[in-house]
C-alpha cells in the first residue's frame, strides 16, 4: 500500500509535528556537514507555504549522562535552519513542560519551532529510545497532525517517531517518501537489470543485505575490505588483508550457489602498513604478498566494475571500495563513483553511510538519482525488513 505523504494533508492553521533527522556532525559547536538539514528543507518549506505551524523534533547523538547535554544541544541546528529558511526558528531548550507548551501556543501560521534534542529524555529511563508510551502520547498532544521525515531513524521504534504516530494522523515527509520510493523500490519493485555494489570493511555488516539482494540483483559487485573474505573462500592468497574467518563458509556457499552473479576484484593496491604514506604496489588479487594488506581495489578492477555496470537500469551502492579516508587509497571509490555517475539512463542510488559520505566529499552528490540519508535504516531496508518508522505512517 502507498503511504500518505505531507501533500495529502490539510495543513492550514494546523500545528504540524515534524520528526526530522538533524543528527548532524558537530565540531566545537559548529555543524561540519549540513546535508541532513538541507534534505529536510522541502518538507518544512511546503508546510510553511500551506500555512501550517511547525514543531520540529530530532535527536542528536547519544545522550548518556547529564554532561552530554551541553555538547548535544540542537541550538546550532536552529541557528543554521533559521539562515537557510531566512526566517526565525524558535528554539525551545526543553523537551516537555509549560515553556514548550506556551511557545507552541504562540505560533502563527508559517512559524517554525525546534524542540530540544529528543534524546535528553533518555537520561530518565531511556524514554525516547525505548518508546515510552506516555512520552509519545504527550508529544502527540502538542499537535494536530504528524509528519515523519526522518528516514535515518525509520529502523528504530522511538517515542518521537512511532510513539507520536500512534496518536495522530501520520504522513511521510518528502524525504521519507523519496527514500521509500528509491531504497524501497530496489527491494520491492526494481527496474531490471539490477546491479548491487557492496563494499566496506566487513561481510558481517552486510550479510543480510547480500542474502536478500542475491535474489533481486542480476550482479553483485563486491569490493572493500569484505572482498578479501570472498577471495580467501576461493583459496586465494590475501596476505594480512582484513579477513573474517567465521564468514568464509558463508562466502563459499554464496559463491557456489550464485557464483555467476558475483564479481570480485582482479587486482588490489597493497601496502605493508595501514598508512596513507605507505609504499603502494598493485598486485593481482589472487597473489597478495604474505606481509602486505589490501587497501583499495586496483585500476583493472575499476575498469572491470565499470564494464559490469554497463546496461544496468538500477544500481544500488553501499560501502566504499577501499580505505577512502586515505587519499592514496581513494582511487577505487572515486573510480566507482565516476562509473556510476556516467550511467545516464539508470536509476542510481547510494544506500547511505560511508558511501554517501564518500560521494558527497568527492563532489558527486548531484550525479546520483538518490543519495540516502540513512545508514542503518538503508541497510535494514535493503535486507528486506519492514521498518517500524515506515510501518507507522498511515496508508493512503
UniProtKB/Swiss-Prot annotation:
SUPFAM superfamilies listed in its UniProt record: Phosphoglycerate kinase
The enzyme's E.C. designation: 2.7.2.3
Pathway: Carbohydrate degradation; glycolysis; pyruvate from D-glyceraldehyde 3-phosphate: step 2/5
Catalytic activity: (2R)-3-phosphoglycerate + ATP = (2R)-3-phospho-glyceroyl phosphate + ADP
Database matches in CDD domains: Phosphoglycerate_kinase
Subcellular location: Cytoplasm
UniProt keyword list: ATP-binding, Cytoplasm, Glycolysis, Kinase, Nucleotide-binding, Transferase
Gene3D superfamilies: Phosphoglycerate kinase, N-terminal domain (3.40.50.1260)
Main location: cytoplasm
The protein's enzyme class: transferase
Biological process according to GO: gluconeogenesis; glycolytic process
GO cellular component, one term: cytosol
Pfam families referenced in this protein's UniProt entry, alphabetically: PGK
Source organism, top-level taxon: Bacteria
Binding positions (substrate): 21-23, 36, 59-62, 119, 156
GO molecular function, one term: ATP binding
Entry binding sites for ATP: 206, 294, 325, 352-355
Quaternary structure and interacting proteins, as annotated: Monomer.
Similarity remark: Belongs to the phosphoglycerate kinase family.
PANTHER family: PHOSPHOGLYCERATE KINASE, PHOSPHOGLYCERATE KINASE 1, CHLOROPLASTIC-RELATED
Protein name in UniProt: Phosphoglycerate kinase
Organism of derivation: Staphylococcus aureus (strain MRSA252)
